[in-house]
Amino acid sequence: MKIVIIIHPILFELPADLSSSLEQHLSKEFDALVKTAVPINDMPPLNLFDKNRKQWKSSEILLWLLGRNKPDRGTKLIAICDFDAYSNGLNFIFGQADADGRVSAIYLPRLRQEFYGLKTDNSLFYKRIIRDST
């Protein structure tokens, strides 16, 4: 059975060229059927947000995505999230995958040069997203 990977943008409109590059990369890397879903433009539940840190709880985001999408064993979900997140014991993360590998998330803010006060570099930003997808 061929693996199916669904790219799910959250609060982010995935540019067509990035979507195409990401689909090609994942298809080649995992010999999978890859498709990009319609973006989720709803905020995750606010109880998944840590107000003190001003960051989202990544492991809780993964559980929310799993419950919302219910992928079967042959389907993998990669969420592209336009918000900052952390995992217990870490100040921040660029991305995280769950233990059984059905759902993962990439968090965009810290992949952008502008986050560090540098000039926008979309080419580097896209490369970072593609690298973090695997």
Question: What residues fall within each predicted segment?
Answer:
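Metzincin-family zinc-dependent endopeptidase catalytic domain
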Residues: 16-133
